[in-house]
Design a protein with these regions (language model features):
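Short beta->alpha linker loops
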Residues: 62, 66, 90, 158-159, ...
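Structured C-terminal cap/extension of enzyme domains
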Residues: 189-393
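Conserved, mostly hydrophobic/aromatic
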Residues: 6, 16-18, 50, 58, ...
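N-terminal binding-site loop/beta-alpha segment at the start of enzyme catalytic domains
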Residues: 1-82, 364-393
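Short hydrophobic/aromatic-enriched beta-strand-loop microsegments
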Residues: 81-84, 172-179, 267-273
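Glycine/proline-rich, positively charged
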Residues: 27-35, 48, 93-191, 195-207, ...
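Hydrophobic packing residues within well-ordered alpha-helices of enzyme cores
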Residues: 71-74, 163-167, 256-259
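Alpha-helix-loop-beta-strand connector modules within alpha/beta enzyme cores
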Residues: 68-87, 137-148, 202-203
Length: 393
């Protein structure tokens, strides 16, 4: 395993982390007596494999159902100074509820403290304002830190980049968890801002939200050859020193194996990556046109400023991936989450977009004339059965 300094925490963070939202029994709290021995045994095998390969950062959340309770059966048996434990708690206007949830997390984990507490889901400017308000959840997290129950405070986010940068600019957080990977590089400005504030940077879900890379289409496999799409994406992310760790949401012990193939390649990333990136970029241009690839995202409105709250940017992004890389299954899964993703994946589908007048909201786009047609086309291509967030399903 390789390790990187996790920003101003000074923790030596493994470049891969063991994410805790895939191995738990279910998404709702239930008594430990209801958890099958087979499921608990699988979780413990995952943690043991993680530690065996040097991944000593174990990440979970109060919102991950039985994850914390199940971890509490194994974590107290481990040398406390050899593991890094992170949990996350969603903020709200009731700080007493925030504290109650955190205390429940600590009780389930059977630990005296966590190394990292993430304020979970600073996804909008309103949530940020509420969190940072006098007497808000950030101040409550600081009290927990002063009481020795938390070592470092961070935040996790699915927010637009400007909200992430604004959160970083408070200089109140030691680290952040965010989305950034090859197919979604929008948040690079946030990573640069985090570097300026010496914050730890944890990449959320690079293999799932990064393209369902555990089940890639043959075309993407060919474009990423000789690496698998998963290893390519890992190497791409970790080739940037400002990125410190990638989450592996393991559902079974063998889920680490493919990721570990990245480690011996890290020193040669600058020689390996350019040819693959050139192929990927070239195929995007070949399928969609050079002008579109360079300018499609210019002048697009936010979903809040679009009739029917259509998330134009996300829909066109998914269309690009589906057409250029045959990432149909991934694009369908994300598209059909629109309307059910809340502030984690906001906005609506392009249903009946033909009946809407998008002229005003697309006035700044160089492709205003064709985007309505493309949205309708994408809806026909991707619409299907409604998808819910994992924690809601």
């Amino acid at each position: 395993m390789q390790y990187r300094r996790f920003g101003r925490t000074n923790l030596q963070m493994p470049v891969f982390s063991c994410g805790g939202m895939r191995y738990q029994f279910q998404w709702q709290d239930v008594p430990m007596s209801q958890i099958p021995d087979e499921n608990q045994g699988n979780l413990e095998a995952i943690i043991n494999k993680s530690l065996e390969v040097g991944i000593n950062h174990i990440e979970t959340a109060r919102g991950y159902g039985t994850s914390e309770m199940q971890l509490g059966k194994i974590l107290p048996q481990l040398p406390r100074d050899k593991i890094i434990v992170q949990t996350k708690v969603s903020p709200g206007q009731d700080v007493r509820e925030f504290r109650r949830k955190f205390e429940q997390s600590l009780q389930f984990l059977r630990l005296d403290y966590v190394d990292l507490l993430g304020i979970h889901g600073i996804n909008t400017a309103e949530i940020l304002d509420d969190t940072m308000a006098e007497g808000g959840c950030w101040q409550e997290a600081k009290k927990l830190q002063q009481q020795g129950k938390v070592r470092f405070i961070g935040f996790s986010t699915h927010a637009p980049t400007d909200v992430i940068v604004k959160t970083i600019a408070t200089n109140c957080y030691d680290y952040l968890n965010l989305h950034w990977y090859y197919i979604f590089q929008n948040n690079w400005l946030a990573i640069e801002a985090a570097k300026q504030h010496d914050m730890g940077v944890f990449i959320i879900s690079p293999s799932d939200k990064g393209g369902h890379l555990y089940n890639p289409p043959p075309k993407l496999v060919a474009l990423c050859s000789p690496l698998s799409p998963m290893v390519f994406n890992d190497l791409f992310c970790l080739s940037h020193p400002a990125v410190h760790t990638l989450s592996i949401g393991a559902a079974r012990a063998r889920d680490f194996d493919e990721h570990l193939k990245t480690l011996p390649l890290l020193d040669r990333a600058e020689k390996i990556l350019p040819a693959i990136i050139e192929r990927l970029q070239g195929e995007m241009i070949n399928c969609l046109g050079d002008n579109w690839v360079k300018t499609w995202s210019l002048g697009l409105p936010s979903w809040e400023n679009t009739p029917n709250h259509i998330n134009i940017r996300s829909i066109l992004w998914l269309r690009n991936l589906a057409i250029a890389y045959d990432m149909i299954d991934f694009a369908k899964a994300r598209y059909n989450l629109l309307g059910n993703g809340g502030h984690w994946f906001p906005g609506q589908q392009a249903k009946e977009v033909e009946k809407l007048d998008l002229t005003a909201c697309l006035a700044a786009s160089p492709h205003a004339d064709k985007i309505p047609h493309l949205l309708a086309e994408t809806h026909r291509l991707l619409s299907g059965e409604t998808v819910q967030r994992l924690s809601s399903s």
